[in-house]
């Protein structure tokens, strides 16, 4: 259904089975017989998800493992083939110091981590892993999904962070490492590369403004960029409050469609602040967030810094909600109060990351470090938390809530998407 009238190469794929291909299949073909066989040896091992590979890395206690997750799996999976490329101890040490400098790891972990990694992930160690046991075959709703994939941009040049559907129906995806975004027509598959101005770098997050333009955080440049989808013109302005010319690391942005001013709200992961930007005057207002001792429930952060991260607006009352990844907080800004009337709460898990507010006002938060997700009720200030399967090895980066209140969670550690129905409390993994 919906396919172009051409011949296709059809592949069958199921974890635990070897891939099988059938060539020259006409669109609309209904009856097709494909013989399958069990995957063995290397063809089975390559199906192992990162969460399983990460589970092979042993720690002395759950606290040490959590500390490692919070410091060494921010931007990539742990244990997959690309992660296992270092060969010698100095190569592993170079990689880890480049990523974190060991600054956030516990001292006793710093002293042992190179050996642990080599003993777990060097080639001959991998050969000694237990045989990978595939999960059961999908059933029910998980078998009804249709997933369409596109290879974005040039081969080996795609490092896409966020995407947004424009009012023209195109999908705009920002390539954080190449200073450009790709406009994809999901109907035809046509892609158009759009270069950002040469003086700004690292487009991170992208959102549609109330006038239909697209705003992007340029995290490495401390700037904000507006793209007019009708004229193709860019406008760039600083992300910090005057007189500063630039911010530290503008991160996630959101725009409330009910806001008559259309303010652009965003976090800055390199400071303890959130910001609002007027889309016409480009006036920036900084909201200095609370210190750790001022949070409801107090508690302690897990890593260095504070790291304001995810952000969203409430469709119920317009409040702005944000998370602090390393500070281990979520917070609320009242845009109608001159000082923001800022409040923060400590969640009962580690690593609140890119949150969203549901149509009913519930704040849904992924617990990146703990492998969970939960909701916070602003009225009762109570949490409800749900574990993902194999929670200790999962690293949910972000979630979203659709118009029906269904929660969709990134299975960052095992290449899945999870659908959670808050009414029935059922989780389906795709």
Residue ranges with predicted function:
Residues 2-24:
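A short, solvent-exposed loop/turn motif at the edges and junctions
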Residues 25-48:
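Extracellular beta-sheet/turn segments enriched in Thr/Pro/Gly and aliphatic residues
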Residues 68-79, 113:
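The canonical Cys-X-X-Cys-His
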Residues 101-133, 169-171, 264, 320, ...:
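C-terminal capping alpha-helices of c-type cytochrome domains
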Residues 134-158:
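A short helix->beta-strand "capping" segment at the edge of beta-propeller domains
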Residues 155-168, 199-211, 242-262, 292-317, ...:
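Beta-rich, blade/repeat-based domains predominating
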Residues 171-177, 215-221, 257, 264-270, ...:
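Conserved beta-strand positions in repeat-built beta-propeller and related beta-rich domains
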Residues 185-189, 228-232, 278-282, 334-338, ...:
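Short loop/turn segments that connect beta-strands within beta-propeller blades
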């Amino acid at each position: 259904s919906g396919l172009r009238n051409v011949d296709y190469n059809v592949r069958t794929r199921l974890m635990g089975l070897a891939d099988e291909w059938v060539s020259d299949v006409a669109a609309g073909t209904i009856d097709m017989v494909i013989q399958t066989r069990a995957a063995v040896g290397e063809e089975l091992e390559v199906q192992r998800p990162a969460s399983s590979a990460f589970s092979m890395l042993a720690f002395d206690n759950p606290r040490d493992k959590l500390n490692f997750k919070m410091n060494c799996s921010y931007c990539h999976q742990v244990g997959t083939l690309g992660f296992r490329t270092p060969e010698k101890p100095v190569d592993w040490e170079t990689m880890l110091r480049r990523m974190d400098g060991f600054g956030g790891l516990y001292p006793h972990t710093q002293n042992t981590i190179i050996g642990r990694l080599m003993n777990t992930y060097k080639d001959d160690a991998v050969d000694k892993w237990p045989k990978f046991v595939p999960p059961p075959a999908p059933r029910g709703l998980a078998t009804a999904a249709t997933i369409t994939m596109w290879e974005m941009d040039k081969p080996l040049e795609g490092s896409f962070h966020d995407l947004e559907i424009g009012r023209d129906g195109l999908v705009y995806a920002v390539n954080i490492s190449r200073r450009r975004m790709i406009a994809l027509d999901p109907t035809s598959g046509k892609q158009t590369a759009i270069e950002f101005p040469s003086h700004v770098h690292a487009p991170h997050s992208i959102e549609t403004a109330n006038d239909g333009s697209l705003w992007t955080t340029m995290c490495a440049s401390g700037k904000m960029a507006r793209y007019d989808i009708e004229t193709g013109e860019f406008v760039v302005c600083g992300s910090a409050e005057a007189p500063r010319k630039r911010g530290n690391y503008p991160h996630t942005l959101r725009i409330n469609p009910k806001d008559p001013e259309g303010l652009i709200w965003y976090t800055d992961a390199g400071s303890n602040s959130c910001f609002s930007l007027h889309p016409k005057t480009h006036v920036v207002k900084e909201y200095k967030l609370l210190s750790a001792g001022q949070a409801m429930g107090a508690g302690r952060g897990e890593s260095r810094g504070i790291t304001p991260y995810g952000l969203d607006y409430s469709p119920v009352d317009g409040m702005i909600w944000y998370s602090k990844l390393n500070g281990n907080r979520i917070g609320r800004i009242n845009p109608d109060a001159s000082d923001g009337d800022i409040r923060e709460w400590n969640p009962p898990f580690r690593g609140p990351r890119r949150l969203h507010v549901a149509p009913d006002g519930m704040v849904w938060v992924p617990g990146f470090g703990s492998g969970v997700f939960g909701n916070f009720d602003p009225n009762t200030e109570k949490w409800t938390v749900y574990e993902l399967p194999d929670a200790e090895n999962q690293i949910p980066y972000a979630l979203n809530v659709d118009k029906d209140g269904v929660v969709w969670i990134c299975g960052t550690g095992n290449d899945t998407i999870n659908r959670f129905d808050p009414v029935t409390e059922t989780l389906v993994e795709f």
